[in-house]
Design a protein with these regions (language model features):
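Gly/Pro-rich interdomain helix-loop hinge
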Residues: 257-336
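A glycine/threonine-rich phosphate-anchoring loop and its flanking beta-alpha core
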Residues: 101-195, 288-289
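Short Gly/Thr/Asp-enriched flexible loops that form oxyanion-binding sites at enzyme active sites
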Residues: 70, 89-103, 135-138
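ATP/NTP phosphate-donor binding region
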Residues: 1-80
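Short glycine/serine/threonine-rich phosphate/pyrophosphate-binding segments
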Residues: 9-10, 34-37, 63, 88-93, ...
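Glycine/serine-rich anion-binding loops at beta->alpha junctions
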Residues: 78-94, 127-133, 261
């Protein structure tokens, strides 16, 4: 549900005030919970109910903190879980709801086959427009600094609520990063080996909304821009739920973990490089799949060729303040190359339309021709 007016807020209150939800466990981040003023909203709506607010501390979904949350949930015994925050909070909420009533999990638990069983209801309230996690059947979890993706149909939230009032307090830097995440997810999913007619349809809706509204959303957002970017994020989530992301996301996790670069910004560092790599490969092998995907890409983005597409993306990153220059960000690629390669997420990399080897990644990161096809 996209909560755009008081009419929708009344509907939301009615849902939360149902008698069956007497004990509510809220997972959130302290800064976003207070800045978005979600704390005022929930304290008022839930004042006659018992509720517990857990503030996550980690920048990533880590197994130690997840187990701590599971313990707290088991102690509190809720009949409703709420996730209020960005992608990390929503992933914690999804994983917590799925693995409850366990008080802890291990790495092996991510690879078991689970039978369908009744789980606690989960409602999520994104405070950024970007991750699309509210629409996906998977969640990210880090174990000893290594990223894993847990996938199960039953992990998806029962309901999601984009409350425009919560989104309005998101800082410019966060809007730029999370908004580009929505853009990259919808565009990456176009090239995924798993993409199909349905995922392409969702990608097209997301791309149309994000490209028209992204810079307004970052610089001088009005209510309509928050709504349109929330819509773009949601449909990017639906697209990657089918197709998944690929190479730019596969490398992004290292830059976030090692250098503290926000996720969407980290994706932007290599996004154009990989799209240009795909295009160069297409010129060589004349792949029918890539020809169809690039035609779809140019049509959706209203560009005529790879040169115009490059200029479009470069304009978005420049005007939104997303610096994609490794040197200016003080990232020494040569010094960190071994770590970059060892921490590249193979699960995401395998979704790429062509096989990418370690030597390709080195070439893509160092060769300037992949960073910009802006002129013929």
């Amino acid at each position: 549900m996209f909560v755009r007016s008081n009419k929708y807020l009344i509907k939301l209150r009615k849902i939360l005030l149902k008698k069956k939800y007497q004990r509510v466990f809220i997972i959130t981040g302290k800064k976003s919970y207070i800045k978005s003023k979600a704390n005022f909203f929930f304290s008022k709506v839930l004042k006659k109910k018992k509720y517990f607010v857990f503030y996550k501390k980690k920048l990533f979904t880590e197994i130690k903190e997840l187990n701590y949350i599971l313990n707290k949930i088991k102690e509190f015994k809720p009949n409703l879980i709420l996730g209020v925050g960005g992608g990390v909070v929503i992933d914690y909420a999804k994983l917590s709801r799925f693995f409850y009533p366990n008080s802890s999990i291990e790495k092996k638990d991510l690879f078991k086959n689970y039978k369908k069983f009744k789980k606690l209801p989960l409602f999520v309230f994104p405070t950024t427009a970007g991750s699309g996690s509210e629409a996906t059947n998977f969640s990210v979890l880090y174990i000893r600094r290594k990223k894993f993706s847990f996938e199960n149909k039953d992990i998806k939230p029962n309901k999601f609520f984009y409350v425009i009032k919560f989104l309005k307090t998101c800082q410019k830097k966060n809007r730029a990063s999370s908004g580009f995440d929505a853009i990259s997810q919808s565009l990456e999913s176009v090239f995924s080996k798993k993409s199909n007619e349905k995922s392409l349809k969702y990608s097209a809706i997301s791309i149309k909304n994000s490209l028209k509204n992204y810079l307004h959303y970052v610089k001088k957002p009005e209510k309509i821009h928050f709504f349109k970017m929330a819509l773009a994020a949601y449909y990017s989530g639906r697209a990657i739920n089918i197709a998944k992301t690929n190479a730019p996301h596969a490398l992004s996790y290292f830059f976030t973990q090692k250098f503290g670069i926000e996720h969407g910004h980290a994706v932007a560092l290599t996004f154009l490089r990989f799209v240009n790599f795909y295009y160069k490969k297409y010129l060589i092998n004349k792949s029918i799949f890539l020809r169809k995907r690039f035609n779809f890409l140019f049509k959706c983005t209203n560009t005529e060729d790879i040169y115009q597409f490059n200029r479009l993306i470069l304009n978005l990153t420049k005007k939104s303040g997303l610096n994609t220059n490794f040197k200016k960000l003080k990232i020494d690629l040569k010094k960190n190359m071994r770590e970059i390669l060892s921490n590249t997420n193979q699960q995401r990399l395998k979704n790429s339309p062509i096989k990418i080897f370690k030597k390709d990644i080195r070439h893509i990161l160092f060769d300037k021709c992949y960073s910009n096809f802006s002129s013929k």
